[in-house]
Amino acid sequence: VPIAQIEKNNAIVNNIIHIRDSIGKKFIHGSVGKTWMVTEKAYSPYFLQTQIDHKLAYETKGTWQLKNDFMAGPFINYAIKDIKNNRYLILDGFTYNPSKAKRDLVFELEAMMKSVVFLP
């Protein structure tokens, strides 16, 4: 994603959520028609500035749901600033595990995402 798309209007968290929702609408659908993934609006996502592979990154954690359906679960998202290529690399992971603990699954997603390395 171009740097300007994340950093426009100084509303970084809103821009990241907008990108998540647009990707969810296009690529992540439920088993019935006219359903797609969106970020749940009832709760504000957790948002933190951090570093991954010595690069500025924004961590966003929250809950996703399927629009027009009854599926939901936690997600974790990293937007990693890649100045060399004038872009943000977006990493997004989510889990669906009805009626079961999701904490360990989210920890696994987080560990995989934090291990990203940029090659020269």
Predicted regions mapped to residue ranges:
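Conserved polar/disulfide-associated segments of primarily extracytoplasmic proteins
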Residues: V1-L91
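Surface-exposed amphipathic alpha-helical segments
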Residues: N86-P120
